[in-house]
Design a protein with these regions (language model features):
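Acidic (Asp/Glu-rich) sequence patches and key acidic residues
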Residues: 1-103
């Protein structure tokens, strides 16, 4: 199992820290990629081989934890999400940023 931190790919501005976006938009975007909570209002979103852990009641969302439970399936989903939503993923054990393929 691998654990990553999900961060915005943009830098903070003078108006405050960069965010991943409004919670509702994140839920909508991830739902379109087969990743969603088990019940409305849930803070853990489940997808193929992955789960996102959101901080309770955080809006806008600054960062999330991403747990990769099935590496064979999960990496394809992570690459699609990262490219589509322009997020970056950092390994919490090494501090290395995940480099997504450019296909």
């Amino acid at each position: 199992m691998r654990i990553l931190v999900v961060l915005p790919s943009t830098s903070p501005s003078d108006r405050g820290p960069a965010t991943l976006g409004p919670r509702a938009a994140i839920l909508k975007n991830l739902r379109s990629m087969n990743t969603q909570p088990e019940c409305d209002g849930g803070d853990i979103l489940y997808g193929p081989g992955i789960e996102f852990q959101l901080a309770p009641n955080q809006d806008p969302v600054v960062q999330m934890i991403l747990v990769v439970s099935d590496e064979d399936i999960g990496w394809l989903v992570i690459e699609r999400i990262g490219r589509t939503l322009k997020w970056k993923f950092v390994d919490i054990n090494t501090g290395d940023e995940l480099v997504l393929s450019t296909n």
